[in-house]
């Protein structure tokens, strides 16, 4: 497959500094990943300015790369809906008037320490989703070998949207919501009662597959 052929090039590079060229599916840092993500954000921004569908949902551990952060803020100002699910540091303020309008930021701090990264972009009729090893930070983008790979199968893409992105955007138990000053408040405090936990829902669905028997409650 294209991905395995690309992975062969990556391993050859790691073993011998073999030049990586002509990749079919993988996007590799420090070579193309930052540029690829910027291109997707700019495409969403252009769609928003044209009055077309414009959506970004990102799930990661940290977002501190300045140029990517500014591009996301610009997308929000242009009218795109931008949701950032960032467990740790995030330098994009949520909904700051005149700077990051249209941007929402939340952190999920539950029982499990997660490391999944999902990047979703919709620009007009075009949808793109990537899974990745990289956070949007300078070290990952420019100093380490990191990978992102596209989710091209529509059914698998929708499954990730439903089971992960949508669930985490509606988490009513473990979420912390950023305000326009960069401060976080617990979603439980904001709603005055706990709601559903995205992590709990995933464990209830898949916990038995790990051989641990009953799902965590």
Regions flagged by a language model, labelled:
Residues 10, 26-27:
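Solvent-exposed, charged helical/coil patches
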């Amino acid at each position: 497959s294209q991905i395995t052929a690309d992975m062969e090039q990556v391993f050859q590079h790691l073993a011998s500094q073999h030049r990586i060229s002509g990749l079919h599916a993988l996007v590799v840092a420090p070579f193309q990943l930052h540029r690829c993500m910027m291109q997707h954000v700019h495409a969403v921004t252009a769609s928003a300015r044209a009055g077309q569908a414009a959506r970004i949902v990102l799930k990661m551990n940290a977002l501190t790369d300045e140029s990517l952060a500014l591009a996301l803020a610009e997308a929000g100002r242009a009218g795109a809906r931008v949701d950032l699910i960032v467990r740790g540091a995030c330098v994009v303020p949520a909904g700051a008037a005149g700077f990051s309008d249209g941007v929402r930021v939340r952190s999920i701090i539950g029982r499990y320490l997660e490391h999944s990264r999902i990047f979703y972009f919709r620009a007009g009729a075009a949808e793109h989703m990537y899974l990745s090893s990289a956070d949007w930070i300078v070290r990952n983008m420019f100093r380490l070998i990191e990978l992102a790979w596209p989710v091209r199968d529509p059914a698998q893409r929708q499954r990730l949207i439903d089971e992960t992105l949508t669930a985490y955007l509606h988490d009513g138990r473990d979420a912390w919501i950023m305000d326009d000053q960069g401060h976080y408040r617990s979603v439980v405090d904001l709603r005055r009662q706990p709601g559903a936990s995205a992590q709990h829902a995933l464990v209830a669905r898949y916990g038995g597959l790990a051989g641990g028997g009953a799902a965590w409650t």
